[in-house]
């Protein structure tokens, strides 16, 4: 999902559906969740996908990991169709749920980081740069405490972008440079290219 390649995702989804005869409820729910992502982004069936996710949530226990995944995706869909109040309510609910989880489990930790990164990104879209930067900085601190680089480069870039409003040029540059090093280590050429452009723009100021 991270590289947004929905053609490949749909291909894998179809293979799983064809070969899956006896599935647990969680496995079936997982496949339904994947289908809503394909419908939303690949086929622009936004309202159908949202309705499908809302229906899934009504049938799944809120204590499960798949519930968290579905709720996070539904939140993102809400933000993309302009349902901001619903998005913010879901975000608050997600944070409450994650506070009951054990972040020592990688899947839980990554989900929590993803939710907080998405919220920081949402705040940027609302031009709430100070709040977005604060959210991103707290999440960066969490990544470093937990010794994970998951979403760390995008978070650093987000702070750099927001920081042009509040920080000195060298501070902003340091965030970009740290993100650039991570992209080199983990071979992320697309983000690396974006960061190089941000650095050029910064040097031109």
Functional labels for PLM-detected ranges:
Residues 23-26, 45, 62-64, 83, ...:
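Short coil/turn linker motifs that delimit alpha-helical repeat modules in TPR/alpha-solenoid proteins
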Residues 2-15, 40-55, 83-97, 127-137, ...:
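Helix-turn-helix repeat elements of alpha-solenoid scaffolds
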Residues 3, 42-43, 74, 81, ...:
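Structural motif corresponding to the intra-repeat A-B loop/turn of tetratricopeptide repeats
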Residues 39-40, 78, 116, 123, ...:
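Residue at a conserved register position within TPR or TPR-like alpha-solenoid repeats
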Residues 30, 69, 107-114, 154, ...:
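Residue register of alpha-helical TPR repeats
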Residues 13-20, 51-61, 92-103, 137-148, ...:
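Amphipathic alpha-helical segments of tetratricopeptide repeats
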Residues 35-37, 74, 112, 119, ...:
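Structural register within alpha-helical repeat arrays
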Residues 1-2, 27-42, 69-80, 118:
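Non-membrane alpha-helical segments in proteins
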